[in-house]
Amino acid sequence: MIEKLEELRAQWRKLQQEVENPSLFSSTQSYRERMRDHAYLSRLMEEYDRYLLTEKQLEDAHVLIQDESDADFKDVIRQEIRTLEAALHTSQKRLKTLLIPPDSLQEKNIIMEIRGGTGGDEAALFAADLFRMYTHYAESKQWRYEVLAVSETELGGFKEITFSISGRDVYGSLRYESGVHRVQRVPSTEASGRIHTSAVTVAVLPEMEETEVDIRAEDVRVDVMRASGPGGQCVNTTDSAVRLTHLPTGIVVVCQDEKSQIKNKAKAMRVLRSRVYDLEESKRQVARARERKSQVGSGDRSERIRTYNFPQNRVTDHRVRVTLYKLDAVMQGALDDIIEPLCIASRESVI
């Protein structure tokens, strides 16, 4: 492992010189690739330096205890050795995980789709709660989000909502949110105080560029219509809503939030590209099928991945068996304590 890390250190030094060269900015694609590689190797080298420092401190402690005659001070050194050994073991595990090259999709922006499932109005209200949870998390990471399509209910919930999140390492962080999210709570409309169980489905798709997904114009049927609001009432007097149908796959995307038909079509195409890519990729990648059977769950959107129990202030992720009694904070976007174990489990499963 050390030999491999030293080779990567040489690559990192060379790459550091390249990213400081102004000529790199002449090619946007080349610049993105170099910066992505530089960011990955910088994280790796930071951990490698931490490992080497801990290893040196451990060696010094072993030498010190051999030369020490004071019994009390020897006990202090032994405790320090135990602490350093644990730190060295942790750093070694991190290095093994980081040595796995990052997924090419890791840095992608995402299209996220949230749909109310079992539970009617309560499921729709929880879909709105999840949307707020993810946008709070995005804001805490200084990511940007944009609503692409939404179907609201009269009570303020969402039958479904589609939105994008863009920023650094978005797909890498949120890819494991796909699946069924179950909620247990007393609905505000429940007079008897009984706890209801509802479900919401979340899908996370990497957002693909035009050049990455080939969608021919003749394969897309475009229909225009008037936008409708909660309950189906018409909210627009012009045909600004757009429905795109991808004829080869049957995928349908509707966008109606903008007053401009052109803007709605552009948003719909962003969603369509990601859905077509996701469908094609899931069909042809056997490797992804293996990944879905790994430690972090199947990735199947019918798989129940998480339960939110409001009376107990508890959230449980069933794939990594993480239970937190701070649901109130989680719903405000404090997701790191759930997301990090999922990412670690995924990477460790392929070591």
UniProtKB/Swiss-Prot annotation:
Function of the protein: Peptide chain release factor 1 directs the termination of translation in response to the peptide chain termination codons UAG and UAA.
Record keywords: Cytoplasm, Methylation, Protein biosynthesis
Q: Name one Pfam family in it.
A: RF-1
Q: Where in the cell is it found?
A: Cytoplasm
Where, per the database record, does this protein carry N5-methylglutamine?
A: 233
The species this protein belongs to is: Treponema pallidum (strain Nichols)
Gene3D superfamilies membership: 3.30.160.20, 3.30.70.1660, 6.10.140.1950
> What protein am I looking at?
Peptide chain release factor 1
Where primarily located?
A: cytoplasm
Q: Does the keyword Electron transport apply?
A: no
